[in-house]
Amino acid sequence: MILADIPVKRPHAMSFTTLEVVNFAFVRVETGDGLVGWGEAACLGGPTWSEESAESVQVVIERYIAPWLVGRDASGIERLRREMARRVQGNPFARAAVEMALWDLAGRALGVPVHRLLGGRVRDSVPLSWSLAVAAPEAELEEAREKVRLGHRIFKVKTGAHPLAHDIERVRRIRETVGAGVALRVDANQGWDRPTALAAIRALEPYALDFVEQPLPKWDLDGMAELARRVSVPIMADESCGSPQDALAIARLGGVSILALKVTKAAGILGTMAVARIAEAAGLGCYVGCMIETSLGTAAYLQVALAAAPVTWGCELFGPLLLKGDVVRRPVSYADGAILALDGPGLGVDIDETALNECARR
């Protein structure tokens, strides 16, 4: 286990925190014949987005997972996933980091990318959404202009940290700046109550939003479903959808039409693919979110984005573009407003241990 902290290139303002540094827990798993796999859990400034932090991930893995994992068959990922779930309640980020390393091992042992083990990729690249979360209005507009010049055609505006009128004006000015040909989304990160969410979305309807993400607290599934039926903009569940069971509950209630996939909140790649399968069966679309991972964690999320058919809303795998540092020898690649497929063995990236040690905690 290695804990590390990597600053972002500019503060990232969200409804629940303003992020200046991302905290990481990196997991290294080695087999008896010397094969090594890596996993990552990225935490947004401690236990802010979820109950977990890099420190809690380390404790759970070192004390409750690693002791029984040693000596087990690393290729039996499903069996190990189920045993982790039995031995460790909750703590999906910790479990995901370990499972991620096991997938990396499995792909490397067979000489194939993880997406081949998930059924093969159904796309060669995934459209990339850039999140606008800049406190200073003019700086935010300039960032949007620069990203458009670089080929970005999808933006997500982080709301809920400001008064509603301020956020509505932000969206209006961003739409005016990027033009009608660029896709625009909004993410409240649970920042609104029911009346505020209804007022906000109706006020934002003139700006042609693709969707509004997680407008209400994660526990308010009834409110999410009711809200979705009262507005014309599609509603996406993120924090509300952390497991296959959550996905099933959301699908049964109806209304919400998009599910956000995240490997760490679903306790691993297998759990994430299960959420995607439920979405597909229920006729829902999917979007691959992020926790601002390095290229290592981004590569794991990308395997899902490439292999899961219902990922029709793109992704926000921009972590390596926002972080000031990375931990791999060759970062993930972007072109024409998309993140490109990785076809190397395992997760498709190789750890640069020198770079990792430079950002590791002392």
Model-predicted regions and their roles:
Residues R202, A208, W219-M236, C241-A338:
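Shared catalytic-loop signature of beta/alpha-barrel
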Residues S129-S131, K156-K158, R185-N189, E213-P215, ...:
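A cross-family glycoside hydrolase active-site/sugar-binding cleft signature
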Residues M1-R185, N189-L198, R202-P206, R230, ...:
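N-terminal capping/lid subdomain adjacent to the active-site entrance of alpha/beta enzymes
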